Amino acid sequence: MKPLHYTASALALGLALMGNAQAVTTIPFWHSMEGELGKEVDSLAQRFNAENPDYKIVPTYKGNYEQNLSAGIAVFRTGNAPAILQVYEVGTATMMASKAIKPVYDVFKEAGIQFDESQFVPTVSGYYSDSKTGHLLSQPFNSSTSVLYYNKDAFKKAGLDPEQPPKTWQDLADYSAKLKASGIKCGYASGWQGWIQLENFSAWNGLPFASKNNGFDGTDAVLEFNKPEQVKHIAMLEEMNKKGDFSYVGRKDESTEKFYNGDCAMTTASSGSLANIREYAKFNYGVGMMPYDADAKDAPQNAIIGGASLWVMQGKDKETYTGVAKFLDFLAKPENAAEWHQKTGYLPITKAAYDLTREQGFYEKNPGADTATRQMLNKPPLPFTKGLRLGNMPQIRVIVDEELESVWTGKKTPQQALDTAVERGNQLLRRFEKSTKS
């Protein structure tokens, strides 16, 4: 028989280990990052968990942005919401009005962790800040903007300069026709058509998308993207479509795959698509700025962000919120934010991450990697080009998709389609306005 004191010591050690295991606070994190992006999310969580053994971030892919938002709100009503929910930028007004969230500045304050809100790039943080207090409601994470990807090898074959992507939409139409004539299957395709062809087109060309400074100044905003400039742009795409120089391939990021598999020579897509393009493209490619309308006065202006931020959900205990604050602080550290930016193509969300990336020589070694950032900082944003804050915006995007599809199929003129989209969208805005006052 073993001596009693050894047995007692072993028992005490075992109980201590069990206690430590039980003390680990699990923090569910629902997101919409798949493929290479999902792998990087997992990597960040694993590193945080290794450095903070009292907490365990559990990332779970819950489908695309719409699916994740719907799932998060639905389970909140049952009391089973995740601690952290990734929500795309147009879900901001919905989250603000949901009463399901705990503002991140409160989370940090209650956890006793210093939180410097000024560290975030203003054009990014402004999208997620309270209009009255200026405090962040959610933490920027995978912020992006739309950029132009182009196949340099296809450019050479078509007799185009592979180092000179089209600067204007008029140039793009001309380039696409030449690419098609050279034998490529698809000259140009676009991802996220509402976000790129109307939301970002408007901001990049110095045009409002909606009144009340795109909704930042009140829920009584009305949509304004059926003006002559936007109608002219959609009409140009319609004409390209008729000629076969513009291919409509889907409502989301389907054009990215069409690009990296070599079908399409050019696409406008999220800067966050760079990770998959870098992984799968078997040809030389370039990253250019979004084209602007050659007839637009003072264009280009500034791009607005897409992507998503991290929202903290209500109803959790103090220890969970402390772990959440530690994780969000971890994500914002320069070395982690810079790595996320460099590996994914999403914007550097903090000034320090941008400076570190530049100091490391990343932009020199990877031409075009700073394109999205330069677009965001091209000019100081106007009151109506800093972003959108419109209720029911996810549903409005669906309406825009439906109406643009009616143009590509020849069922409506650009003016008819945009007028109808504005009319239908305004009905949703009034419904949202009413709900916030009830």
UniProtKB/Swiss-Prot annotation:
Q: Which family does it belong to?
A: Belongs to the bacterial solute-binding protein 1 family.
**Keyword field:** Periplasm, Signal, Transport
Which GO BP annotation is one of this protein's? transmembrane transport
GO CC, any one term: outer membrane-bounded periplasmic space
Q: Summarize subunit and interaction data from the UniProt record for this chain.
A: The complex is composed of two ATP-binding proteins (UgpC), two transmembrane proteins (UgpA and UgpE) and a solute-binding protein (UgpB).
Q: Where does sn-glycerol 3-phosphate bind?
A: Y65, E89, S144, S270, G307, Y346, R397
Q: Does the keyword Signal apply?
A: yes
Primary subcellular site in the record, as a coarse category: periplasm
Native species: Shigella flexneri
What is the protein's given name? sn-glycerol-3-phosphate-binding periplasmic protein UgpB
* General function of this protein: Part of the ABC transporter complex UgpBAEC involved in sn-glycerol-3-phosphate (G3P) import. Binds G3P.
Name the Pfam families on file: SBP_bac_8
Q: Supply the gene name.
A: ugpB
Q: What is the lineage of its organism?
A: Bacteria, Pseudomonadati, Pseudomonadota, Gammaproteobacteria, Enterobacterales
Localization, UniProt: Periplasm
Residues spanning the signal sequence: 1-23
